[in-house]
């Protein structure tokens, strides 16, 4: 009876959880439908276009810079399993060279059991022993030749100076002595080599005891047939761009691509990180988001202002711009850039780096957003440029030298203050430019610099992307290379039918599951940052009843009648000015006030 009671209790809990989730989904869909009915999306078209252009330029410039700087460098394939170095199409990395060569990410070659590749190491030892033996034989032969020449000279002198038969018989005796010396040297050489071979066998026996039964099987790399190897066995195998592009997607997890240690001075990671962060901050000044994680963070912190549909459209245009830019760069320059952001082996480490970095960066951006909002509220009553329409009508010519003064009611190059204070004394600056946007940049320069150096630290030190749009663009470009450009022709139907293959579908699913931390980490970090900011948010904001009149109905006389009773919602007080500004000032869509 107790077990049945517990089972019924768990069933009731499950039903309650399902009903709660279903209710949340229904309410969310209802809000989306109301937003679609109420919102006029045409007024956001310039914002969507700006997000598309900003994302395209951001990804395009960084990709071009990195691809163009690294396209002539040699890269290295490192196989993660034990490999026989003397087989064709295999790649071998000697244990000694791993520690001597300064290459990031190099590790000892170990199999699944954690045991070193003893067969390969023994082969290298035998190779080195043979080289030493050949060198010793060469020195011994030279020594024997010198002894033989000395004996020959002594024998000829004795033949010329002596006539007796006893002296003539000494010649073969000396030859016998020389041959005995040579035989003794060879005997000593054989003894040394036998001792060395015995020691090697003893050492090999000590290793072989701990080996498993399947360690004698050879593991070949059959999917890298076009790799051009160097002559020396104990060096990394260097490859070019075309060899990387010809790899098989199925076996890609078995290898690791590294940069040659001799070319490490040509690495421009710090330069393009600085360049990318600078572009990002410049677009933040212009008012773009460029980061879907930050866009959804703004929606979470103020859902009434942005709306789920508007936020999704923002992110969609960001993704489209980034993907097109990445594919265009890969089509022009190659695909080296793709392999720098492929899924990492350490999933949790990647997720934590992306999560923590995006969490801290989103807090900075949201603080910057709140500071912008306060700046707008504090400066909303200041005088701006006033456009005098009456003077334009009375102007004789638009090409007048005083056209600016006629339009804006004062001269931009005036040395007097526009306000009648201190009897219009001269200002310190010779050019007085009363523009709130310049004031906005000057007042926010500290935040912008702080965000810039924070971005530079996260990208350069932790090697994280901080942007799911950037990671998704890279992955889509990788698939473009594998399934489109490999055929040297673009045929939509052939590409579509090639994706219907069950094997390719499974490969893509596995590939994207492994790369989930590249975009789940930023989204999770930004979501936690919004909840953290809401803990310190003032909930006592002024709420007014605002009627959204973006949707109208027409009567028989073709008069516009607002749907007053249909779309009635509560907004924050400052949103009334926001909606009026965006509706009646269409020429200022890209102004910072909108964001």
Curated annotation (Swiss-Prot):
Gene3D superfamilies noted in UniProt: Glycerol uptake facilitator protein (1.20.1080.10)
Pfam families: MIP
Source organism superkingdom: Eukaryota
Gene Ontology BP terms: development of symbiont in host
GO MF assignments: water channel activity
Transmembrane intervals: 47-69, 270-298, 308-333, 344-369, 435-462, 514-536
InterPro entries per record: Aquaporin-like (IPR023271), Aquaporin_transptr (IPR034294), MIP (IPR000425)
Keyword presence, Transmembrane helix: yes
This protein's UniProt keywords: Membrane, Transmembrane, Transmembrane helix
Disruption phenotype: Dramatic reduction in development of mature sporozoites in the mosquito vector with no impact on any of the preceding stages. Greatly limited parasite transmission from mosquito vector to mouse host.
Reactions catalysed, as given in the entry: H2O(in) = H2O(out); glycerol(in) = glycerol(out)
Cellular compartment(s): Endomembrane system
Coiled coil: none
GO cellular component: endomembrane system; plasma membrane
Topology term for the membrane: Multi-pass membrane protein
Purpose: Required for sporozoite development in the mosquito vector. Required for parasite transmission to the mammalian host.
Record remark on domains: Aquaporins contain two tandem repeats each containing three membrane-spanning domains and a pore-forming loop. One of the two canonical Asn-Pro-Ala (NPA) motifs in the pore region, which are highly conserved in aquaporin water channels, is changed to Asn-Pro-Met (NPM).
Family label: Belongs to the MIP/aquaporin (TC 1.A.8) family.
Protein name: Aquaporin-2
Species for this entry: Plasmodium berghei (strain Anka)
Source lineage: Eukaryota, Sar, Alveolata, Apicomplexa, Aconoidasida
